[in-house]
C-alpha cells in the first residue's frame, strides 16, 4: 500500500489548497489565469509547426492534445507503476483515460515505493516493459532528474512556479494529509495520544517503513509535531512509535486493503487520499471506516510528483497521460479520491472544479507543515540512525 512520497513544492502551495478547501477561495497569488487548454480533451494549444508527439516538450510542440493522444493510441498502451486503484482514485483515473483515448493502461507493481519505481525503470530499460510514467516522492525524485523527459501539458500556466520544475521535468500533481484511519467499532480516535490505549494492543499499523515509504516517513513527522517536536526535531516522533512498539500496539505489518478488510490492521496511519478510497469498498463488508487528521499536532502534507521516463517505451502515450491527469477531468478525479489537485485554485476560478468532491475532502483549519528539502535530508539521516526498534516489511 505504500509508496515513497514527500515534498518538492513550496509550503505556500499546500497552504493555498487548504484555504481553497476550507473557505472556497477562488484565487491564488501564485497561479496564472486558468487556461482553457486545460479542459479535458480537445486539440488545445495545437501548433502549426508541431514536432513529434513522441519527443515533444510542450502540448503545442506535439501538435495539440488530440494529435499527441492519437499517436499514443498507435503505441497501444501506457505503462504505470506504483498506482494502486484506491490511491487517490487512480483506479478510476485509469479507466476514464482508457475510455477517452482508447489507450490501454498497464499498471505494474501497484504497491511499489518510489525507489522501486526507479529501480524497475533501470532494470527494464530498453525492454519495452519499463514504466513510462513516474509518480514520486521528493527524496527519490530529486535524486534522479536525469531520468526524466521534460514536458509541459496544456494546463502548465495554471500550475504555480513553486509546484513544477521550470522545464517540466517534474510537476507536483496532488497532495493530502497524514491521518489516522480506523474501524469505528473501536470507538472514537481523534489524536495520536489515543493510540497508546491498551485496548489498541496489536491493532496499529504505519503505512510503510519510514526509511523507504513517505507515508511512514511523514507519519513520524506528524507524531513528532503531536509530541513537542518540530520539522527540525523528529526525536519525539521516533520516541512515540518506540513507545507504541513497547506497548505492543504498533505491529510490524505493512497495511493494505486485505489486512484492513480482515481486521488485521484496524487502525492505519497513512495519507487521507490513500485511506479515503477504502470507505466505499469496506462499507459492504460491514466496516465503517473513519479518517481523522490528528488534532494534537499541526497537519502534515506533501505533494507527489509526476514525471515522464525519458526511456519510455510509449512516449506519446506517456505525454497523453500527463495531459489527462492535469486536465480538469483528471484533477477532479483525484479530488474525488480525497486528494487536493495542484490546479485546484485555477479550476475554482474557472468554475470547473467538482464542488461536491471538494466539500467531501475537507481540510484542517491549521496551516500544514511541509518539510523543506534540507529538513527532509536531515530527517532521513536521523531516521537511518534511530529507527531500529521495528521493521515494517515492504
Description of each model-found segment:
Residues 348-394:
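Extracellular/periplasmic bilobal clamshell ligand-binding domains
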Residues 139-145, 267-287:
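A ligand-binding cleft/hinge motif common to bilobed small-molecule-binding domains
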Residues 175-179, 238-243, 249, 285-310:
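Periplasmic-binding protein-like
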Residues 21-32:
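Bacterial lipoprotein signal-peptidase II cleavage site
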Residues 299-300, 304-368:
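Mature extracytoplasmic/periplasmic domains
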Residues 16-20:
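C-terminal motif of bacterial Sec signal peptides marking the signal peptidase cleavage site
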Residues 62-74, 83-104:
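Short, polar/charged alpha-helical segment
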Residues 79-94, 106-122, 129-264:
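Extracytoplasmic ligand-binding site segments that recognize negatively charged/polar headgroups
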Amino acid at each position: 500500500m505504500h509508496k515513497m512520497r514527500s515534498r518538492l513544492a513550496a509550503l505556500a502551495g499546500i497552504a493555498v489548497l487548504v484555504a481553497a478547501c476550507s473557505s472556497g477561495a477562488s484565487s491564488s497569488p501564485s497561479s496564472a489565469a486558468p487556461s482553457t487548454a486545460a479542459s479535458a480533451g480537445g486539440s488545445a494549444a495545437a501548433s502549426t509547426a508541431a514536432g513529434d508527439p513522441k519527443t515533444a516538450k510542450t502540448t503545442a510542440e506535439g501538435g495539440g492534445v488530440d494529435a499527441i493522444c492519437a499517436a499514443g493510441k498507435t503505441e497501444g498502451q501506457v505503462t504505470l507503476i506504483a498506482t494502486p486503484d484506491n490511491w487517490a482514485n487512480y483506479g478510476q483515473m485509469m479507466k476514464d483515460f482508457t475510455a477517452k483515448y482508447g489507450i490501454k493502461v498497464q499498471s505494474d507493481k501497484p504497491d511499489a515505493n518510489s525507489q522501486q519505481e526507479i529501480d524497475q525503470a533501470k532494470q527494464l530499460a530498453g525492454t519495452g516493459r519499463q514504466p513510462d510514467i513516474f509518480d514520486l516522492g521528493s527524496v527519490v525524485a530529486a535524486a534522479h532528474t536525469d531520468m526524466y523527459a521534460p514536458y509541459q501539458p496544456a494546463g502548465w500556466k495554471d500550475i504555480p512556479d513553486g509546484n513544477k520544475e521550470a522545464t517540466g521535468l517534474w510537476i507536483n500533481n496532488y497532495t493530502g494529509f497524514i491521518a489516522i484511519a480506523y474501524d469505528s467499532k473501536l470507538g472514537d480516535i481523534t489524536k495520536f495520544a489515543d493510540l497508546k490505549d491498551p485496548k489498541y494492543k496489536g491493532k496499529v499499523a504505519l503505512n510503510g517503513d519510514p526509511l523507504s515509504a513517505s507515508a511512514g516517513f511523514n507519519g513520524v513527522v506528524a507524531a513528532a509535531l503531536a509530541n513537542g517536536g518540530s520539522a527540525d526535531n523528529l526525536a519525539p516522533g521516533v520516541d512515540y512509535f518506540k513507545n507504541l512498539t513497547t506497548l505492543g500496539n504498533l505491529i510490524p505489518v505493512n497495511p493494505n486493503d486485505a489486512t484492513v478488510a480482515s481486521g488485521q490492521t484496524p487502525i492505519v496511519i497513512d495519507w487521507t487520499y490513500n485511506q479515503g478510497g477504502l470507505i466505499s469498498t469496506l462499507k459492504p463488508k460491514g466496516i465503517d471506516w473513519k479518517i481523522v487528521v490528528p488534532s494534537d499536532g499541526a497537519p502534515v502534507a506533501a505533494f507527489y510528483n509526476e514525471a515522464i521516463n525519458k526511456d519510455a517505451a510509449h512516449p506519446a502515450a506517456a505525454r497523453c497521460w500527463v495531459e489527462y491527469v492535469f486536465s480538469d477531468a483528471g484533477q477532479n478525479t483525484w479530488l474525488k479520491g480525497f486528494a487536493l489537485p495542484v490546479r485546484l485554485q485555477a479550476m475554482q476560478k474557472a468554475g470547473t472544479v467538482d464542488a461536491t468532491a471538494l466539500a467531501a475532502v475537507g481540510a484542517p483549519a491549521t496551516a500544514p507543515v511541509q518539510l523543506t528539502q534540507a529538513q527532509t535530508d536531515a530527517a532521513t539521516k536521523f531516521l537511518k540512525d534511530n529507527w531500529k526498534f521495528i521493521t515494517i516489511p515492504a
